Amino acid sequence: MNLKSDRLLIGHFKRADLQEWFLIERDPSVRKYILDGSVLNEEQSLAYIEQNIASYAKFNFGRYTLRDKKSLRLIGMCGFLNTDMGIDFGYRLSKDMWGYGLGFEAANAVLAYGIKVIGLNHIVAGVMPENLASIKILERLGFIYQTDVIYERKTYHKYMFSSNKN
């Protein structure tokens, strides 16, 4: 999978991405709204990459790398994860990339790819209520708030996107 947006190159995770990915995953600001907020160590970062590599093979989707088109630096991820609640949509960016509209740019491109190329119809997203930037992105993409859910003792807003608007 090689997808491009105006400022991003979007592709599959590879084991060679470990050092760049670890720099993102060890930042407490980036991890603040993810599960318990714990940063990942290098071993956990590699496990995350391997989980996505396995997901590409098994489901034909996963979380994808986001690279800056100019520098080719790995700056985040965006994509899909098969979960008990359905196909989950998620994204995150390196803190130095916040505030430039890259979250929406990536999410818009990857969501369109998921619908048009992979054929996904119903997609869920869980977001902590205080993560206003992510809520704004989801709502701008057309995700609709469904309910609040408790996961690992934290409250999340559950959003749903359906490509079948009937």
Predicted regions span which residues?
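Acyl-donor (CoA/ACP) binding surface of acyl/acetyltransferases
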Residues: 1-33, 50, 67-166
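Short amphipathic alpha-helix in the helical subdomain of ABC transporter nucleotide-binding domains
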Residues: 41-45
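A short helix-loop-beta-strand connector motif used in the catalytic cores of GNAT acetyltransferases and
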Residues: 53-65
